[in-house]
């Protein structure tokens, strides 16, 4: 009988599982302290700005619509600011998606990827996923 590992890319087996940072409450309990500010997960200790809250309120009635994944309106607005056409821009759902997209497009097996340490884990992840060799 075949195992699922026999059907996937062999590089998948080299990937480490993501280990998220501990929640603030757990760190406070573990060390017996209060007032911890967590920066590792890009959490803002001040919360969202009032302008963001207002924007979310304004957008709330249309959240049932699937967003334009091509970001047509955004591209049209920012292209003139840079003197470029809209097709020069690519947007993604955060750095993870963009780094992965670049890696999937340009990395080949055995390419060497040089990165600084410590670094964002996605560089190592996509390098291994594509069979490239991450080098710190």
PLM regions: where:
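N-terminal "arm"/small-domain region of PLP-dependent enzymes with the aminotransferase-like
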Residues: 2-65
């Amino acid at each position: 009988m075949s195992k699922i590992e026999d059907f996937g890319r062999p590089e998948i087996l080299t990937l480490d599982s993501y280990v998220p940072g501990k929640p603030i409450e757990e760190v406070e309990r573990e060390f017996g302290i209060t007032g911890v500010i967590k920066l590792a997960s890009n959490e803002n200790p001040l919360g969202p700005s009032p302008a963001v809250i207002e924007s979310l309120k304004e957008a709330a009635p249309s959240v049932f619509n699937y967003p334009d994944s091509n970001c047509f309106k955004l591209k049209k607005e920012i292209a003139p600011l840079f003197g470029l056409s809209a097709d020069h821009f690519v947007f993604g759902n955060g750095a993870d998606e963009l780094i992965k997209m670049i890696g999937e497009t340009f990395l080949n097996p055995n390419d060497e990827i040089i990165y600084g340490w410590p670094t964002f884990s996605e560089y190592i992840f996509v390098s291994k996923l594509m069979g490239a060799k991450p080098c710190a």
